[in-house]
Amino acid sequence: IIRTRIGRGYYTQRDLTCAPISKCSYLQRATLPNETAFYGCISDSNKQLEYGRIIGLYECSKLARSETECIGRQYVTASQWKILQPLKCISFINDKTFPRTNDLSKQIRFIIEAYKKANLTTVQKELGNFLTTEFCKQVRPNHNHEYLITATIIHDMLYANEYNYDAVLYPSVPVEGRFGINIVIKPDIVKNKLSLYRVINQSYFKSEIESLLRIDGGYDNKGHLLSAEKQDADEKICKKLGIRSLKELPIIK
C-alpha cells in the first residue's frame, strides 16, 4: 500500500499513519467530520511504486489537480506499507465506474468482471449504480457536503456491527480510475495488520508547460537514510520544465 502526505520530514509510522482528529473537522470522501482513517492506494503490481506515487500526488496536492496556468513546487512524502495479515474489504465499484476511461487499472477491471458474474437482483444493481455514481463524483472545492453519502456509507461499512470491515476500496476520482485503486482503513487495523516499510522524499514541480514528480531520497522504517541521490539533477528538471531556475517556481505548502 502507498500512502502520501504533503510536506517532508516525516519518517516514523506515527507521522505517516492517520491525521490527528483535531485536523479532521470537515467531510471527506471517506470520512465524516471528527473521524480519522488511513487513506492509501494499491497500484498495479508491475509498476506499484510509480503508479502509487501518481495516485497519491493527485489525491493530496491541490497544485497537481489545478489548471495548467498554476505553477509551483511542492514537497511530497510517499510511504510504502506491508500488509501483515489479510484485510476484510468491500468495494464500491461496478461496470458504471468511469465507463469512459479506456485504461482502467487492473484492480478495477478485475472487480468489474467479478461484479458482472454476480447473481444480483434489479434492486441490488440499481443501488450499486447509485453508489458507484457517488464514489465517482467530482466534487468542487468548498462543496465538501457532497461527500456526505460516501462518507456515511464507508463509516457504516467500517464500524456498524453487521458489517465491521477492515477497509473499503473505491476508485480514485482525480485520475478517473487509472493506475490503481484507493483504500481507506480503520486506524486500529493499521496498528495490527500493517507495517511501515519505506519512506520516499519527493519534489513536485509544475511550470506552465510541464509537470514532474522527482524522487529525492529514501529512508527505511527506522528513519535511517537509504539514499540521498536525486532522481534527476536540478538542471535537467529545469530543462524539462522550460525554465532557467527552480526559483522561478514558488514553494507551495
Q: Where are the language model's segments positioned?
A:
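Active-site and NAD+-binding cores of ADP-ribose-processing enzymes
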Residues: I1-T31, S66-K253
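Short, well-ordered beta-strand elements within core beta-sheets of diverse protein domains
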Residues: T36-K47
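DNA-binding interface regions
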Residues: L32-P33, Y51-I54
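Active-site periphery "cap/insert" segments of enzyme catalytic domains
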Residues: K47-L49, Y159
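Short active-site loop/helix that positions an aromatic residue
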Residues: R53-A64
